[in-house]
């Protein structure tokens, strides 16, 4: 699709400009999350629990691992060591997010500006569909950090849709 490939060219420019900082942040952040969850899963495997319960818990935390998310909390039955480790992991990921926040906002603003600039340029050439799509992409991404994060993660983010 011509519109999506035109949009991907802009996304690639932004990834090229800001990708190193994002990848560095992502690697550290994901490392903290994965480290905690792998420790938690291996601890669960060694607990004297019924196999069904173990399997359910492991499956639950493997879901977190896949999404690269920390759980909000652990049940009271978990040892203090793991609760402390979760607290430390949360503090560390929060610090990493705060440390990277300005760079993320700058990358996102750069993307939004490039969309506007490109929209104006293609509209002057009479490419109305492309111009409107770039303007719409700017509009749907403006307050949507999750969408921009997916773009930076090189996920397939579809063409924008009217809200």
Language-model regions: role of each:
Residues 1-163:
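Low-complexity, Gly/Pro
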